[in-house]
Design a protein with these regions (language model features):
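Non-catalytic beta-sheet/beta-sandwich ligand-binding modules that flank or precede catalytic cores
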Residues: 1-271
Length: 271
């Protein structure tokens, strides 16, 4: 139930002592971090003890000290047995914080990286996390990194095919002794991410003072762009045959520009 110089998670441990010869009595086992609940009994040439940890988390050792074992002639061991030590850990890790975030600006979209930063109550092994967006599994491979033994970051890159909607996740982990967290972490202590992979389009381009594919006679033209959704910045208008004298400004959901022809007679386009 225990690995030497590592961990054990058993509620009781069975300690087996193997002497070099037949003994005249049960050897004395010295225990730190626990108590002997069943005294040693001979099993063939071995002696078997049951040891109970003193607490849920305990550094433990067992050893047969000098003089702790004697043969039938009364000769005692002049050297202690190997000191077998381990850490008893019966406490499962818990989550202290779970922070969901995304790189970039605003909602997540193609090539942005979604991260879940996990801070458990103790050092843990690499977690296992899954991510969904809009209820469907995200296409990217989850990768893991650490900022400390008890702080882990799970990352997934947004794919263009990922479904629009809120990002959900499920993460589990185990401590270094192998104790699993009681239940998966499915809610963030802070942060939320929404995937928006819908590419905006310009649904209408209107030019006041001109007829498309015909003529215009204004000294300046007012160009109004209507996008398919709210934009995060003013769209770039390209003009041939003229210059933008007033940069685009938002007017409700539209963007308005003032364009001046380069000369008195000019073929013009805006796009």
């Amino acid at each position: 139930g225990a690995t030497e110089d590592a961990y054990g998670v058993a509620s009781t441990y069975v300690v087996t002592i193997t002497p070099s010869e037949t003994l005249g009595a049960v050897p004395t086992l010295t225990v730190t971090g626990g108590t002997i609940t069943t005294a040693g009994a001979a099993s063939s040439s071995d002696y078997v003890y049951t040891v109970t940890p003193s607490s849920a988390d305990e550094a433990m050792t067992v050893v047969v000290a000098v003089g702790g074992a004697a043969d039938s002639a009364g000769n005692t061991n002049t050297a202690a047995s190997n000191n077998f030590g381990w850490t008893h850990d019966a406490t499962a890790p818990t989550s202290t914080t779970a922070v969901l975030a995304v790189g970039g600006t605003g909602n997540g979209n193609h090539a942005d990286v979604v991260t879940m930063t996990l801070d458990p109550s103790e050092a843990v092994n690499t977690p296992t996390c899954t991510f969904t967006s809009g209820g469907a599994a995200m296409a990217g491979t989850v990768t893991y990194s650490t900022s400390s033994p008890d702080s882990h970051i799970a990352s997934v890159t947004v794919a263009d095919a990922d479904t629009n909607g809120a990002v959900a996740f499920s993460c589990t982990y185990a401590d270094l002794a192998g104790n699993n967290i009681a239940s998966a972490i499915t809610s963030a202590s802070s942060g939320s991410v929404t995937i928006d992979n819908t590419h905006p389009t310009i649904t209408t381009v209107a030019v006041a003072g001109a007829t498309e594919d015909a003529y215009g006679v204004a000294s300046t033209y007012v160009v109004t762009l209507t996008p398919s959704e709210t934009l995060s910045a003013v769209p770039t208008l390209t003009v041939t045959g003229g210059t933008i004298t007033t940069a685009g400004a938002a007017s409700n959901a539209n963007y308005v520009y003032t364009v001046t022809p380069s000369s008195a007679d000019e073929a013009m386009t805006v796009v």
